[in-house]
């Protein structure tokens, strides 16, 4: 299934393009990945194609934070041929431009994502006032610290590099 359609969830074993952002309503003070917290460990989730996001690093970190499978959408043709066509939305999809980034991100996240694939979220905390430092605790005790800031941080005795993540393995 693609997207977050609640009516189809009982019949799905995979939700592709799970929403990564909040509704954007002005009533909320902080965005919390409720959809992923509620469904992770019940159904497999993937993010939208990372190379189609405005900020690829932030989207990658959101996938790590939520334990969602990484996804890219690629083509082999020259994307200039797609401008002003029905396929205009995939003009940033030439695989040659993304393969090295995808390999790097996948190799950094693979171990963690495999470890938490069937776990549920026990706790999700914003550790900084601006919400750029997040701690997620999984049901096996694994702690993931995600740093969206451009400065290194320390949390729970763990150093978390800028715009990266760190893992503290559970029992």
At which residue positions do the language-model features occur?
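Active-site-proximal substrate-binding groove within the catalytic cores of carbohydrate-active enzymes
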Residues: 1-171
